[in-house]
Amino acid sequence: MDDGTERTEFAPSRRGFLTGTAATAGGLAASFHAGEVEAQVAERPAPGALVDVTFTLNGEARTLAVDPRRTALDLLREGEGLTGTKVGCRHGQCGACMIHVNGAPVLGCLTLAAQLEGAEVVTIEGLAGQAEAAGIATEEGLHPVQAAFIENDAFQCGYCTPGQIMSAVVVIAEGHASSEDEVREYMSGNLCRCAAYPQIAAAVMQAASEMGATAEGGGARQDLHLGVPAPFAEDEA
């Protein structure tokens, strides 16, 4: 029935329609993102919760419950009693905590224990056994690098010696021990406060000669210790 009253029908503008649609979509996206964040928080281990890490340590299988915040250095020394890996600077600058992870030089102070999952880890305590398994151990049952350090008096206080030896093994394996200058360059990530560098270089060159190393590679220079450790960088690429 027409009562004579004028009526105006409402028709939304194009701008109003788009604005409303965008606001609705934004609200839905925000809700979805909030749900994702809540799910991630729910899956995250509670503070202080331990995680299981399975790896090989000096040829023996290990499954350990570790604090995700704990470093490999502390795990090896305090958890496993392998005190040959030394505490130095805890900043990746001295090389005293050098270990091998999947054959590469890695600083224990910059590596989380949880990163060792599935890895083969060798410390100074396992080096002689590794040499024996490879058929290169000396008559005294030492790795050739260990024997060369003894013969050349390549230490004084001895605190840095385990890290020096662990780096030297990699430097030799990668073919960077052809001269004293080259040894010094590729061993530069390891500091010796007693300044036994001439004897250290001589020991590395002697061991390289005895082992007949000819391989080529990246070496153990300090620049390779910074950032993501090499054994893990490749897995994450």
Predicted regions and their residues:
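Signature of N-terminal electron-transfer/Fe-S-associated modules in redox systems
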Residues: D2-A237
